[in-house]
Amino acid sequence: VIVGGGFGGLKLANKLKKSGFQVVLIDKNNYHQFPPLIYQVASAGMEPTSISFPFRKIFQHRKDFYFRMAEVRAVFPEKNMIQTSIGKAEYDYLVLAAGTTTNFFGNKHIEEEAMPMKNVSEAMGLRNALLANLERAVTCSNKQEQQELLNIVVVGGGATGVEVAGVLSEMKKFVLPNDYPD
């Protein structure tokens, strides 16, 4: 059983292709998403379907592969069993490759106000918020409120933060003058 269909889970599932093992992949989504391009979804540069690939399609010709869309609720190593949102699953070997969570480093304000971007759903939330703020700013008569709507803070200097900052800069320079001339 492999829990998590990110890069690690997919790599292992592919490595086990001719191993003789029956592979069960469990993920909360029924698709693999390509994290390096999530920022493109957030900036409306790409659609979610361009970076999302259904597990069943990826492994459709594998006879020893099974996919279950579920979330793991508990692990019972002494019983070689996991409890998921759709029931129990037994295993000979268990690999936990469920990915990461956003680290706010104890900053409660950022944790409460920030919009993390670890998946397509969060990227779409960010995209919708950006576009809604742009539309509201166009019709806003209060200059201070308009400035607040257009003020964007990128927290984090990792790959995602740098990519988001870069694409926002490109949008400001090339997209916004054409799409929002007023």
Labelled PLM ranges:
Residues 66-153, 171, 176:
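FAD-binding core/adjacent interface of flavoenzyme oxidoreductases
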